[in-house]
Amino acid sequence: MRCAALGLVVLLCVGCQGGVVAPWAVPARVGRTFDTPGPLMAVLAQRRGRLATLKARARFTLRTPEQDISADHAVVLRAGRALRLETLSPLGQPTGILVATGDHIRWVEPLSGRYWDGPMSSEAIGRVTGLPLDLEEMVAILTGTLPPVADPSDVRLEHEPGGKAYRLLIEEGPLAGRQVAVVARRDLTVRSRIRYDARGREVLWVTNDRFRAIGGYPFPWREEVTLPHRALSLTVDYQWVRLNQGVSDELFELLIPPGAQRIEWE
């Protein structure tokens, strides 16, 4: 299991070229001062909704106490609904393919003739990738956005020292913990997020960096993810990105090769 997990964690990228997206209408509130969370959350939701599909190629570097692993990956996603990740060999061949949808996940190793599939859950994604995160969180990480917030009334807004950023304190319920997000005041991009579990432990750090506009849409070309309780971190360096160019349904219909052996993980 560990070898498959490490191989797929470095996997998040599928054939993307260029970087074209229909012009993004800059919200009228960008550049203005927010004193309450509601209007800022509305802008972030608008931006998240503006990103429908992504295709990209990226370099993934996974760091664990035992070793560092680096490989190119391909990413294809439909925001909030489906994700396809391919780990690529030095020759560009996919050595592992993950397809995750709202209710199902499948992992195929084309070269070794092995596969695994099952119901969608954060545990299932963790089994394959080593990152026990749900589909919504994975998409938010890969796009540098703030995941949807169920109840905006549970958000508090503070101003960072120096006045260059906002801090959003998001309560996610007594059993779910909370989240703190830092949003740049200049362009309202999500620069970092920290998740805490119900006991107050930091369980996820996300940092977005190297923002560049794609058709007017501010996109982070470097993302760093850390799971401190697992001593595991992942850096994603995008090489090229295409936004809102559409993706084929067939990319999310991963077939099991004839004669493939099912992976039995404990």
Task: Tell me the role of every PLM-derived stretch.
Residues D35-M41, T53, E109-Q179, L254-P258:
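Flexible, processing/modification-adjacent segments and terminal tails
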Residues Q46-L54, E66-I69, V76-R81, R186, ...:
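Edge/loop elements at the starts and ends of beta-strands within beta-rich repeat scaffolds
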Residues R59-P65, P90-Q93, W107, A213, ...:
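Hydrophobic lipid-interacting interfaces of membrane-associated proteins
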Residues D151-W265:
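Gly/Pro-enriched, hydrophobic low-complexity segments
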Residues M1-C16:
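Sec-dependent bacterial lipoprotein signal peptides
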Residues G15-S70, E264-E266:
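N-terminal leader/targeting segments and the immediate start of mature chains
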Residues G18-V20, R81-E137:
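An acidic-aromatic
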